[in-house]
Amino acid sequence: MSSPVKSAELSFADIVESDRAVWEVQTAAPGPEGRLPLTAEMLLERPSGDIFGLTQNAGMGWDPRELGRPGFLLLSTQGGIRAPDGRPVALGYHTGHWEIGLLMQAAAEELARLGCLPFAAFCSDPCDGRTQGTTGMLDSLAYRNDAAQVFRRLIRSLPTRKGVLGVATCDKGLPAMMMALASSADLPSVLVPGGVMLATSDGED
């Protein structure tokens, strides 16, 4: 039986005599420039959450002059972290949800061009190919209902949205997204099946 690995000892002198730069932590930064498009009517009639949301939108860098635009929500099952050049920074669970962030970006840019204020939220999906022969298979069918519930809650949690676009793939994420959009019958919705759906150039399947 191997002995536990001991961590390097750190003395008090190591701490007090360390490079002072490690203690120079940035705790403040300039806020976004501009003014929120507030009106007397908004302050009197709108929910307080709408006003708070404006501060969050500006804090993320959106031009305050455009925050009065109609909001449109984009949902997806994106997984992994893909660098702009396509290099994997962190892998997803399967190739189906690996690149749908590109579709989300294209949709968001088009919505912004058309005068909307795009929002995006995500709930990724598992791969039962990976869980074959393990107890992870027990989660595949249950995931559909769980994710549909999460997507529905994400829709309701953005009260200012005027419509929803869902991008999803495969036999778990796509049904989950379909159920979520179908349950939001009061909103205009678009479902986009995305991901790796082209046949390989060299192979049977």
Where are these regions (language model features)?
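Metallocofactor- and cofactor-centric catalytic cores in central/energy metabolism, strongly enriched
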Residues: 1-205
